């Protein structure tokens, strides 16, 4: 299973890779094409969700962002994200968020 993350923040990358060592970080949507699971940071790549869905129609897309940014959450869902989580819930346990959608 190939897990790809469109996450640019180094601290976020560190937290994700500590929980999901097999993750591959990419800097653009083209890097997501052959992934099974794709993580998207909505703060930096929120507008990319629809393009990622187009390039990887069968992948599970898990997006995270600020809990107060309801508009971005709705846009991510409309763009094809399977799961959209507040940052706090996603980072509580990234591996569980990818497996179950919402962590413990």
Language-model features: locations:
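Conserved acidic segment of CheY-like receiver
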Residues: 2-9
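Two-component/phosphorelay signaling modules centered on CheY-like receiver
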Residues: 10-26
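Short acidic low-complexity segments
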Residues: 25-34
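Conserved phosphotransfer microenvironments
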Residues: 39-52
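Short secondary-structure boundary segments
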Residues: 42, 65-66, 88-89
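Mid-chain, well-packed structural core segment of small domains
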Residues: 49-83
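Output/docking surface of receiver
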Residues: 81-92
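Receiver (REC) domain switch/output surface
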Residues: 96-104
